[in-house]
A protein has these predicted regions:
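Extended interaction regions within the primary functional domain
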Residues: 66-101, 195-207
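Short C-terminal domain-edge/linker segments immediately following a structured domain
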Residues: 42-43, 81-86, 137, 174-183
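A conserved amphipathic terminal alpha-helix motif
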Residues: 161-208
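Hydrophobic ligand-binding cavity/cleft-lining segments
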Residues: 1-78, 82
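Short, surface-exposed, polar/charged, turn-prone segments marking secondary-structure boundaries
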Residues: 69-71, 78-81, 133-135, 171-177
Length: 208
């Protein structure tokens, strides 16, 4: 059974655009701010990262989720094709921004190494994140997070007795709650690491 989770977040940092870009490009430092992340490994030969997350199910049994991602970085302008699409989707007002942006993507890797599953509750999923930094006229930096994950669970007894639609809805709701908590925790860590203004923070979770 495939389940999906989504989260969105926005924060305004007092730090300059260049310094903010360096901070958010530090992949391992940033992802380890996630309270559910137990390990990050860089597979140099493949130029990909392996995430391992661990959460507890309603019965306090550990569930291990493994993701393989590749990081990409690129600069953009709010006047180019990507920038216009981003502004239409995420910005209510373009006035605060000078048009300069940086995009950091964690792209799901489909052709990845085999992962040895040590427990039946270990699942290899797909995750993708887009972090967009926008330079404001006042020198501050707006940061937008968008994260999507997908896990394919094997349903065991007695859960297999439940209608799949109901079970899928319940699982995606729980997954979204976990993603909200993780995003909020990461942003709190960012706030403690670099000087922030009172943040404009929106965190949303939901199924695909």
């Amino acid at each position: 059974m495939e389940v999906f989770g989504k989260s969105k977040a926005h924060i305004v940092l007092d730090s300059r655009f260049h310094e903010s870009g360096i901070y958010f490009a530090d992949y391992e430092k940033l992802i380890m701010c996630n309270p559910y992340c137990s390990n990050v490994k860089y597979l140099k030969d493949l130029d990909i990262f392996q995430w391992i997350f661990q959460v507890a199910d309603p019965r306090s049994n550990p569930i291990i989720a493994v993701f393989f991602v590749r990081q990409h970085e690129e600069n953009f302008s709010l006047d180019d094709g990507y920038g216009k699409a981003f502004a239409d989707a995420r910005l209510k007002n373009r006035a605060p921004y000078n048009g300069k942006g940086k995009r950091i993507r964690w792209e799901a890797v489909h052709d990845h190494p085999e992962f040895e599953k040590t427990t039946p509750n270990t699942f290899v999923g797909k995750a993708s994140t887009e972090i967009c930094l926008l330079h404001q006229h006042d020198g501050k930096t707006s940061v937008y997070f968008d994260t999507d994950i997908c896990l394919d669970f094997e349903i065991s007894f007695p859960l297999s007795l439940m209608p799949e639609g109901i079970l899928k809805f319940m699982t995606e709701t729980i997954m979204s709650q976990i993603m909200q908590q993780a995003t909020e925790s990461m942003l709190c860590k960012v706030q403690s690491d670099i000087c922030c203004s009172v943040p404009e923070l929106i965190v949303e979770g939901g199924k695909k």
